[in-house]
Amino acid sequence: MAKSSSTKRRPAPEKPVKTRKCVFCSKKGKNQVIDYKDTQLLRTYISERGKIRARRVTGNCVQHQRDIAIAVKNAREVALLPFSSSTR
């Protein structure tokens, strides 16, 4: 049987996680309303492939991420936003 190596690995130092603040909860975003007709705002929360970006990527709080997801889905139904990207 082969002996296991006696050298122990040091655990990698943990990188500090940058927490992004919700844009809509901040002072300058208080007067912003999430609406399905505001496609310019909603496009910032959609990836190039047409998927809704995750909360950990956008930095939104739970409630505003839900509101964005609902608004994007409504805009897709009304054909203001595409369901998927046109490029392959």
Swiss-Prot record:
A GO term from the CC aspect: cytosolic small ribosomal subunit
Record keywords: Ribonucleoprotein, Ribosomal protein, RNA-binding, rRNA-binding
A GO BP annotation: translation
PROSITE patterns in alphabetical order: RIBOSOMAL_S18
Pfam families: Ribosomal_S18 (PF01084)
GO molecular function: small ribosomal subunit rRNA binding; structural constituent of ribosome
Entry keyword Electron transport: no
Keyword Nuclease: no
InterPro entries cross-referenced by the UniProt entry: Ribosomal_bS18, Ribosomal_bS18_CS, Ribosomal_bS18_sf
Matching NCBIfam families: S18
HAMAP family tied to this protein: Ribosomal_bS18 (MF_00270)
General function of this protein: Binds as a heterodimer with protein bS6 to the central domain of the 16S rRNA, where it helps stabilize the platform of the 30S subunit.
Entry's family note: Belongs to the bacterial ribosomal protein bS18 family.
Subunit structure: Part of the 30S ribosomal subunit. Forms a tight heterodimer with protein bS6.
Protein name in the entry: Small ribosomal subunit protein bS18A
